[in-house]
UniProtKB/Swiss-Prot annotation:
Glycans are attached at N89, N131, N170, N205, N295, N345. Belongs to the small leucine-rich proteoglycan (SLRP) family. SLRP class II subfamily. Binds keratan sulfate chains. It comes from Gallus gallus. GO terms for cellular component: extracellular space. Affects the rate of fibrils formation. May have a primary role in collagen fibrillogenesis. This is Fibromodulin.
Amino acid sequence: MRWANILLVAGLCRASLGQYNEEEDLAWLQYYMRQSRMSSYNYMPYYEDENSPYVYSYVPAPDTEAEPVPEAQQASSWQCPQECDCPPNFSSAMYCDTRNLRYLPFVPTRMKYVYFQNNQITAIQEGAFDNATELEWLALHNNQISSEKMGKRVFAKLKNLERLYMNNNNLTKMPSPLPRSLRELHLSYNQISKVPSNALEGLENLTALYLSHNYIFEMGASLKGLKSLILADLSYNHLRKVPDGLPMALEQLYLEYNYINAIPDDYFKVSPKLLYVRMSHNSLTNQGLSTNTFNSSSILELDLSYNRLQKIPRVSTNLENLYLQGNQINEFSISSFCTVVDVMNYSRLQVLRLDGNEIKRNAMPPDAPLCLRRATVIEI
Protein backbone atom coordinates (compact mmCIF):
# COMPACT_ATOMS: atom_id res chain seq x y z
CA MET A 1 0.00 0.00 0.00
CA ARG A 2 2.91 2.31 0.65
CA TRP A 3 4.03 2.23 -2.96
CA ALA A 4 0.45 2.63 -4.10
CA ASN A 5 0.12 5.90 -2.16
CA ILE A 6 3.39 7.24 -3.58
CA LEU A 7 2.36 6.36 -7.15
CA LEU A 8 -1.08 7.85 -6.59
CA VAL A 9 0.36 11.14 -5.35
CA ALA A 10 2.80 11.23 -8.27
CA GLY A 11 -0.01 10.74 -10.71
CA LEU A 12 -2.18 13.44 -9.16
CA CYS A 13 0.69 15.91 -9.06
CA ARG A 14 1.33 15.37 -12.72
CA ALA A 15 -2.33 15.89 -13.53
CA SER A 16 -2.40 19.17 -11.56
CA LEU A 17 0.44 20.58 -13.61
CA GLY A 18 -1.61 20.24 -16.76
CA GLN A 19 0.30 17.25 -18.04
CA TYR A 20 -2.55 14.78 -17.74
CA ASN A 21 -2.93 12.24 -20.56
CA GLU A 22 -5.72 9.74 -20.02
CA GLU A 23 -4.26 6.83 -21.99
CA GLU A 24 -0.71 7.14 -20.68
CA ASP A 25 -1.32 8.18 -17.12
CA LEU A 26 -3.94 5.59 -16.22
CA ALA A 27 -1.74 2.77 -17.57
CA TRP A 28 0.41 2.68 -14.42
CA LEU A 29 -2.69 2.38 -12.24
CA GLN A 30 -4.14 -0.45 -14.32
CA TYR A 31 -0.81 -2.26 -14.19
CA TYR A 32 -0.61 -1.89 -10.41
CA MET A 33 -4.13 -3.24 -9.89
CA ARG A 34 -3.38 -6.22 -12.11
CA GLN A 35 -0.23 -6.97 -10.15
CA SER A 36 -2.06 -6.63 -6.84
CA ARG A 37 -4.68 -9.15 -7.88
CA MET A 38 -2.07 -11.63 -9.10
CA SER A 39 0.16 -11.40 -6.04
CA SER A 40 -2.67 -11.65 -3.52
CA TYR A 41 -3.39 -15.35 -4.19
CA ASN A 42 -2.53 -17.65 -1.31
CA TYR A 43 -1.28 -21.06 -2.51
CA MET A 44 -3.02 -23.45 -0.15
CA PRO A 45 -2.38 -27.23 -0.09
CA TYR A 46 -4.76 -29.11 -2.36
CA TYR A 47 -5.89 -31.47 0.38
CA GLU A 48 -7.22 -30.12 3.63
CA ASP A 49 -6.63 -33.47 5.32
CA GLU A 50 -3.99 -35.91 4.07
CA ASN A 51 -5.85 -38.77 5.73
CA SER A 52 -8.76 -38.29 3.34
CA PRO A 53 -7.14 -38.79 -0.07
CA TYR A 54 -10.41 -39.15 -1.97
CA VAL A 55 -11.97 -35.88 -0.76
CA TYR A 56 -11.26 -34.16 -4.04
CA SER A 57 -12.50 -30.61 -3.37
CA TYR A 58 -12.15 -28.20 -0.49
CA VAL A 59 -15.48 -27.36 1.20
CA PRO A 60 -15.54 -24.20 3.38
CA ALA A 61 -16.92 -24.35 6.92
CA PRO A 62 -20.72 -23.76 7.17
CA ASP A 63 -20.39 -20.45 9.04
CA THR A 64 -17.96 -18.96 6.55
CA GLU A 65 -18.41 -17.69 3.04
CA ALA A 66 -15.90 -18.59 0.37
CA GLU A 67 -14.08 -15.57 -0.96
CA PRO A 68 -14.64 -15.14 -4.71
CA VAL A 69 -11.55 -15.92 -6.74
CA PRO A 70 -10.82 -14.56 -10.24
CA GLU A 71 -11.30 -17.10 -13.04
CA ALA A 72 -7.58 -17.38 -13.82
CA GLN A 73 -6.85 -18.18 -10.18
CA GLN A 74 -9.61 -20.81 -10.03
CA ALA A 75 -7.86 -22.62 -12.88
CA SER A 76 -4.59 -22.65 -10.98
CA SER A 77 -6.14 -23.75 -7.66
CA TRP A 78 -6.32 -27.37 -8.87
CA GLN A 79 -3.07 -27.14 -10.73
CA CYS A 80 -1.22 -29.75 -8.71
CA PRO A 81 -1.85 -31.87 -5.59
CA GLN A 82 0.59 -31.11 -2.78
CA GLU A 83 1.99 -34.66 -2.93
CA CYS A 84 3.17 -34.18 -6.53
CA ASP A 85 5.14 -31.92 -8.84
CA CYS A 86 3.65 -30.33 -11.96
CA PRO A 87 6.35 -28.51 -13.97
CA PRO A 88 5.09 -25.13 -15.29
CA ASN A 89 6.76 -25.77 -18.65
CA PHE A 90 5.04 -29.17 -18.95
CA SER A 91 1.59 -28.41 -17.62
CA SER A 92 0.01 -31.70 -18.74
CA ALA A 93 2.40 -33.86 -16.66
CA MET A 94 2.16 -34.75 -12.97
CA TYR A 95 5.04 -36.43 -11.12
CA CYS A 96 4.07 -38.29 -7.95
CA ASP A 97 6.70 -41.04 -8.10
CA THR A 98 8.94 -42.27 -5.25
CA ARG A 99 7.12 -40.48 -2.41
CA ASN A 100 5.93 -43.35 -0.19
CA LEU A 101 2.33 -42.68 -1.19
CA ARG A 102 -0.26 -45.19 0.02
CA TYR A 103 -3.11 -43.80 -2.05
CA LEU A 104 -3.71 -42.16 -5.40
CA PRO A 105 -3.83 -38.36 -5.29
CA PHE A 106 -6.49 -36.58 -7.29
CA VAL A 107 -5.64 -36.18 -10.99
CA PRO A 108 -6.58 -32.77 -12.45
CA THR A 109 -8.62 -32.72 -15.64
CA ARG A 110 -5.95 -31.44 -18.02
CA MET A 111 -3.32 -34.06 -17.17
CA LYS A 112 -2.06 -36.34 -19.95
CA TYR A 113 1.05 -37.88 -18.37
CA VAL A 114 0.87 -39.08 -14.77
CA TYR A 115 3.60 -40.92 -12.85
CA PHE A 116 2.75 -42.85 -9.66
CA GLN A 117 5.54 -45.46 -9.82
CA ASN A 118 7.77 -46.51 -6.90
CA ASN A 119 5.24 -45.94 -4.14
CA GLN A 120 3.23 -48.13 -1.75
CA ILE A 121 -0.17 -47.74 -3.39
CA THR A 122 -2.38 -50.78 -2.72
CA ALA A 123 -5.71 -49.85 -4.29
CA ILE A 124 -7.37 -47.98 -7.14
CA GLN A 125 -10.94 -47.04 -6.34
CA GLU A 126 -13.69 -47.09 -8.95
CA GLY A 127 -13.86 -43.69 -10.62
CA ALA A 128 -10.33 -42.67 -9.60
CA PHE A 129 -9.58 -41.44 -13.13
CA ASP A 130 -13.06 -40.36 -14.24
CA ASN A 131 -12.02 -36.71 -13.94
CA ALA A 132 -8.88 -37.21 -16.08
CA THR A 133 -10.23 -38.60 -19.32
CA GLU A 134 -7.42 -36.97 -21.34
CA LEU A 135 -4.76 -39.28 -19.86
CA GLU A 136 -2.38 -40.77 -22.45
CA TRP A 137 0.39 -42.14 -20.23
CA LEU A 138 -0.26 -43.73 -16.82
CA ALA A 139 2.63 -45.14 -14.77
CA LEU A 140 1.63 -47.30 -11.79
CA HIS A 141 4.53 -49.75 -11.74
CA ASN A 142 6.48 -50.76 -8.63
CA ASN A 143 3.56 -50.48 -6.22
CA GLN A 144 1.48 -53.02 -4.26
CA ILE A 145 -1.78 -52.85 -6.21
CA SER A 146 -3.88 -56.02 -6.03
CA SER A 147 -6.70 -57.11 -8.34
CA GLU A 148 -9.12 -57.33 -5.40
CA LYS A 149 -8.60 -53.66 -4.54
CA MET A 150 -8.93 -52.31 -8.06
CA GLY A 151 -12.20 -50.99 -9.51
CA LYS A 152 -13.67 -53.24 -12.19
CA ARG A 153 -13.96 -50.45 -14.76
CA VAL A 154 -11.29 -48.12 -13.46
CA PHE A 155 -9.67 -47.63 -16.91
CA ALA A 156 -12.82 -47.83 -19.03
CA LYS A 157 -13.32 -44.06 -19.46
CA LEU A 158 -9.74 -43.29 -20.45
CA LYS A 159 -10.47 -43.08 -24.17
CA ASN A 160 -7.07 -41.54 -24.99
CA LEU A 161 -4.84 -43.81 -22.89
CA GLU A 162 -1.92 -45.17 -24.94
CA ARG A 163 0.53 -46.55 -22.38
CA LEU A 164 -0.31 -48.32 -19.13
CA TYR A 165 2.49 -49.43 -16.80
CA MET A 166 1.43 -51.82 -14.03
CA ASN A 167 4.46 -54.10 -13.86
CA ASN A 168 5.80 -55.06 -10.43
CA ASN A 169 2.50 -55.10 -8.54
CA ASN A 170 0.36 -57.82 -6.91
CA LEU A 171 -2.12 -58.39 -9.73
CA THR A 172 -3.61 -61.88 -9.99
CA LYS A 173 -5.98 -61.09 -12.88
CA MET A 174 -5.81 -59.17 -16.10
CA PRO A 175 -7.23 -55.65 -15.71
CA SER A 176 -10.34 -55.42 -17.86
CA PRO A 177 -11.94 -53.75 -19.71
CA LEU A 178 -9.12 -51.72 -21.18
CA PRO A 179 -9.53 -48.74 -23.54
CA ARG A 180 -9.26 -49.39 -27.29
CA SER A 181 -6.72 -46.58 -27.59
CA LEU A 182 -4.07 -48.57 -25.70
CA ARG A 183 -0.76 -49.09 -27.55
CA GLU A 184 1.48 -50.52 -24.83
CA LEU A 185 0.46 -52.71 -21.90
CA HIS A 186 3.09 -53.48 -19.25
CA LEU A 187 2.05 -56.20 -16.77
CA SER A 188 5.32 -58.05 -16.13
CA TYR A 189 6.33 -59.18 -12.62
CA ASN A 190 2.83 -59.78 -11.27
CA GLN A 191 0.98 -62.93 -10.18
CA ILE A 192 -1.37 -63.35 -13.13
CA SER A 193 -2.17 -67.02 -13.79
CA LYS A 194 -4.56 -66.90 -16.73
CA VAL A 195 -5.33 -64.66 -19.69
CA PRO A 196 -8.95 -65.22 -20.76
CA SER A 197 -9.64 -65.14 -24.49
CA ASN A 198 -11.63 -61.91 -24.14
CA ALA A 199 -9.18 -60.14 -21.80
CA LEU A 200 -7.59 -58.19 -24.65
CA GLU A 201 -10.68 -57.98 -26.81
CA GLY A 202 -11.03 -54.83 -28.89
CA LEU A 203 -7.42 -53.65 -28.41
CA GLU A 204 -6.86 -53.16 -32.12
CA ASN A 205 -4.19 -50.49 -31.57
CA LEU A 206 -2.05 -52.50 -29.13
CA THR A 207 1.50 -52.83 -30.45
CA ALA A 208 3.40 -54.15 -27.41
CA LEU A 209 2.30 -56.61 -24.72
CA TYR A 210 4.56 -57.36 -21.75
CA LEU A 211 3.45 -60.28 -19.56
CA SER A 212 6.76 -61.83 -18.56
CA HIS A 213 7.51 -63.09 -15.04
CA ASN A 214 3.96 -64.10 -14.12
CA TYR A 215 2.36 -67.50 -13.41
CA ILE A 216 0.41 -67.76 -16.67
CA PHE A 217 -0.39 -71.34 -17.64
CA GLU A 218 -2.95 -70.56 -20.34
CA MET A 219 -3.24 -67.87 -23.00
CA GLY A 220 -6.04 -69.31 -25.13
CA ALA A 221 -6.74 -67.25 -28.26
CA SER A 222 -6.21 -63.93 -26.49
CA LEU A 223 -3.61 -62.71 -29.03
CA LYS A 224 -5.58 -63.52 -32.14
CA GLY A 225 -7.54 -60.29 -32.54
CA LEU A 226 -4.62 -57.95 -31.82
CA LYS A 227 -4.10 -56.93 -35.42
CA SER A 228 -1.50 -54.24 -34.62
CA LEU A 229 0.58 -56.28 -32.15
CA ILE A 230 4.31 -56.18 -32.96
CA LEU A 231 5.86 -57.48 -29.73
CA ALA A 232 4.58 -60.16 -27.34
CA ASP A 233 6.72 -60.98 -24.30
CA LEU A 234 5.34 -64.07 -22.51
CA SER A 235 8.66 -65.28 -21.13
CA TYR A 236 9.16 -66.63 -17.59
CA ASN A 237 5.68 -68.09 -17.17
CA HIS A 238 4.12 -71.56 -16.77
CA LEU A 239 2.87 -72.06 -20.33
CA ARG A 240 2.68 -75.67 -21.52
CA LYS A 241 1.49 -74.77 -25.00
CA VAL A 242 1.91 -71.84 -27.34
CA PRO A 243 -0.94 -69.30 -27.60
CA ASP A 244 -3.72 -70.28 -30.01
CA GLY A 245 -2.94 -68.24 -33.08
CA LEU A 246 -0.58 -65.34 -33.62
CA PRO A 247 -1.36 -61.84 -34.98
CA MET A 248 -0.39 -61.11 -38.57
CA ALA A 249 1.66 -58.02 -37.70
CA LEU A 250 3.78 -59.76 -35.04
CA GLU A 251 7.55 -59.21 -35.34
CA GLN A 252 8.92 -60.29 -31.95
CA LEU A 253 7.79 -63.31 -29.93
CA TYR A 254 9.42 -64.13 -26.60
CA LEU A 255 8.44 -67.45 -24.99
CA GLU A 256 11.63 -68.44 -23.19
CA TYR A 257 11.52 -70.04 -19.73
CA ASN A 258 8.20 -71.87 -20.05
CA TYR A 259 7.22 -75.56 -20.27
CA ILE A 260 6.26 -75.76 -23.95
CA ASN A 261 6.94 -79.17 -25.53
CA ALA A 262 5.33 -78.89 -28.97
CA ILE A 263 4.43 -76.40 -31.70
CA PRO A 264 1.57 -76.97 -34.20
CA ASP A 265 2.22 -77.32 -37.93
CA ASP A 266 2.59 -74.01 -39.81
CA TYR A 267 2.25 -72.14 -36.53
CA PHE A 268 4.45 -69.24 -37.64
CA LYS A 269 3.09 -68.99 -41.20
CA VAL A 270 0.23 -66.72 -40.11
CA SER A 271 2.77 -64.06 -39.07
CA PRO A 272 4.66 -63.19 -42.28
CA LYS A 273 6.51 -60.30 -40.59
CA LEU A 274 7.92 -62.35 -37.71
CA LEU A 275 11.63 -61.58 -37.21
CA TYR A 276 12.66 -62.76 -33.73
CA VAL A 277 11.56 -65.95 -31.97
CA ARG A 278 13.00 -66.85 -28.58
CA MET A 279 11.99 -70.18 -27.06
CA SER A 280 15.01 -71.14 -25.00
CA HIS A 281 14.61 -73.04 -21.72
CA ASN A 282 11.47 -74.96 -22.66
CA SER A 283 10.81 -78.69 -23.17
CA LEU A 284 10.79 -78.84 -26.97
CA THR A 285 11.54 -82.19 -28.63
CA ASN A 286 11.82 -83.14 -32.30
CA GLN A 287 8.70 -85.27 -31.88
CA GLY A 288 6.75 -82.14 -30.97
CA LEU A 289 7.80 -80.30 -34.13
CA SER A 290 6.78 -80.76 -37.74
CA THR A 291 9.39 -80.81 -40.49
CA ASN A 292 8.93 -77.16 -41.44
CA THR A 293 7.86 -75.61 -38.15
CA PHE A 294 10.71 -73.07 -38.20
CA ASN A 295 11.12 -72.92 -41.98
CA SER A 296 9.66 -69.42 -42.17
CA SER A 297 11.35 -67.07 -44.62
CA SER A 298 10.83 -63.98 -42.44
CA ILE A 299 12.55 -65.18 -39.24
CA LEU A 300 16.04 -63.73 -38.79
CA GLU A 301 16.84 -64.88 -35.24
CA LEU A 302 15.78 -68.16 -33.63
CA ASP A 303 16.74 -69.15 -30.09
CA LEU A 304 15.99 -72.80 -29.21
CA SER A 305 18.78 -73.25 -26.70
CA TYR A 306 18.34 -75.41 -23.59
CA ASN A 307 15.55 -77.63 -24.84
CA ARG A 308 15.47 -81.40 -25.54
CA LEU A 309 16.21 -81.44 -29.25
CA GLN A 310 18.22 -84.35 -30.66
CA LYS A 311 18.37 -83.09 -34.24
CA ILE A 312 18.83 -79.69 -35.83
CA PRO A 313 15.38 -78.55 -37.04
CA ARG A 314 15.02 -77.39 -40.62
CA VAL A 315 15.27 -73.61 -40.92
CA SER A 316 14.94 -71.07 -43.71
CA THR A 317 17.97 -70.03 -45.74
CA ASN A 318 17.16 -66.43 -44.72
CA LEU A 319 17.83 -67.14 -41.04
CA GLU A 320 20.84 -65.19 -39.71
CA ASN A 321 21.25 -66.28 -36.06
CA LEU A 322 20.49 -69.76 -34.69
CA TYR A 323 21.05 -70.70 -31.05
CA LEU A 324 20.90 -74.43 -30.25
CA GLN A 325 23.33 -74.73 -27.35
CA GLY A 326 22.41 -76.90 -24.38
CA ASN A 327 20.32 -79.50 -26.24
CA GLN A 328 20.93 -83.20 -26.95
CA ILE A 329 21.87 -82.88 -30.63
CA ASN A 330 24.20 -85.66 -31.78
CA GLU A 331 24.50 -85.07 -35.52
CA PHE A 332 25.21 -82.22 -37.90
CA SER A 333 22.71 -82.41 -40.74
CA ILE A 334 23.51 -79.97 -43.54
CA SER A 335 20.01 -80.49 -45.00
CA SER A 336 18.67 -78.54 -42.04
CA PHE A 337 20.23 -75.43 -43.59
CA CYS A 338 20.45 -76.14 -47.33
CA THR A 339 18.19 -78.53 -49.25
CA VAL A 340 20.54 -78.16 -52.22
CA VAL A 341 24.20 -77.25 -51.85
CA ASP A 342 25.85 -75.46 -54.77
CA VAL A 343 27.27 -72.09 -55.75
CA MET A 344 23.85 -70.46 -56.03
CA ASN A 345 22.13 -72.08 -53.04
CA TYR A 346 23.46 -71.31 -49.59
CA SER A 347 22.36 -70.22 -46.14
CA ARG A 348 22.51 -66.60 -44.91
CA LEU A 349 23.34 -67.89 -41.43
CA GLN A 350 25.94 -65.76 -39.64
CA VAL A 351 25.91 -67.20 -36.10
CA LEU A 352 25.40 -70.88 -35.25
CA ARG A 353 25.79 -72.14 -31.70
CA LEU A 354 25.84 -75.89 -31.08
CA ASP A 355 28.01 -75.96 -27.96
CA GLY A 356 26.79 -77.98 -25.00
CA ASN A 357 25.39 -80.77 -27.19
CA GLU A 358 26.49 -84.33 -27.90
CA ILE A 359 27.84 -83.47 -31.32
CA LYS A 360 31.58 -83.62 -32.01
CA ARG A 361 33.71 -81.13 -33.89
CA ASN A 362 34.63 -83.61 -36.61
CA ALA A 363 30.96 -84.29 -37.29
CA MET A 364 30.66 -81.30 -39.65
CA PRO A 365 30.13 -82.58 -43.22
CA PRO A 366 32.55 -81.57 -46.02
CA ASP A 367 29.95 -79.46 -47.85
CA ALA A 368 29.22 -77.37 -44.74
CA PRO A 369 31.65 -74.54 -45.70
CA LEU A 370 29.84 -74.14 -49.03
CA CYS A 371 26.37 -74.10 -47.47
CA LEU A 372 27.36 -71.93 -44.49
CA ARG A 373 29.71 -69.58 -46.35
CA ARG A 374 28.22 -66.50 -44.67
CA ALA A 375 28.78 -67.79 -41.13
CA THR A 376 31.26 -65.83 -39.01
CA VAL A 377 30.66 -67.77 -35.76
CA ILE A 378 30.13 -71.54 -35.51
CA GLU A 379 30.53 -72.99 -32.03
CA ILE A 380 30.44 -76.75 -31.49
